[in-house]
Amino acid sequence: MDTIKFTLKEDAQGNKNPILPEGVKNYLIDIDGTVGEDIPNEEPERMATAEVFPDALAQVNKWYDEGHVIYFFTSRTEAHREVTEQWLKKHGFKYHGIIFGKPRGGNYHGIDNHIVKATRYKGKFTDFVLKEATVEVFND
């Protein structure tokens, strides 16, 4: 795994915050049902043999090779760390880390003091295209 290169930017209060270089994205990518077969936590014995989605593997590795930050963000638990890391390695995924314990059930709505973008996976990974959409924001 490559080291992530940040610059420190000072805010109005004098605090230094890590900032990615221009054009570099932080990807948070689900595992089950997104880069491979959808396996529920209740069936961990299937995780080691889950089918990989080849287009997802190619796109994730392309983003990594382009210098983007790749983290898998999964509802799997820490108890699934070993089988998850082995599966990712077996299939050749390039990534910087894994965050376990994502809330289950879907219907996610991210709130952050940084720009947040989300892309719903609908069965195939491709390059992104621009599309106009309505988004929910806080009332100014």
Predicted regions and their residues:
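HAD-like aspartate-dependent phosphatase fold
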Residues: 1-140
